[in-house]
């Protein structure tokens, strides 16, 4: 009988370095059986809404995410079943009609600002991480990402950060830190923490293979 996959949850504020940590762990297992499940792709489908209304969506609130679908997909992957992972179009502010076929793997990384917010998702995780990074650095990273990758202006990113992102972080994201098994400061630059995580994952995999 095949052993259960190892699930790692990686949470933290926008621009904290979650993706860097995720990519670092992924690279360490390159060539092995590992996949990434990005919460950013699981924003709720808004294709039925006018574009102007979609622009008002608060993407930093827990209710913006389709956690029901993410939970369903994670359960399928834990049963070694394939899924059709959604694609989110950040320029159109809605879910794409296309999907990505994903085969199950032995290691699953769930990454997102609210990766630890939903109890159902947490209960499926073997290791829960929170990436803790200074707020000034997080806003700089967010500006760079949203202007380059999501077609946003600098002014709109800053306005959104002050009016939405920062208060949502303080109210909803920061409190999920208490659910973390490990808190990683300085994101992807903390190579010691990442190496320790890789060792822990390998230990769990070996124990389940015995």
From Swiss-Prot:
GO terms for molecular function: ATP binding; cytidine kinase activity; uridine kinase activity. This is Uridine kinase. GO terms for biological process: CTP salvage; UMP salvage. It comes from Bacillus pumilus (strain SAFR-032). Its main location: cytoplasm. ATP binds at residues 12-19. It is found in: Cytoplasm. Keywords: ATP-binding, Cytoplasm, Kinase, Nucleotide-binding, Transferase. GO terms for cellular component: cytoplasm. Its EC number is 2.7.1.48. Pathway: Pyrimidine metabolism; CTP biosynthesis via salvage pathway; CTP from cytidine: step 1/3; Pyrimidine metabolism; UMP biosynthesis via salvage pathway; UMP from uridine: step 1/1.
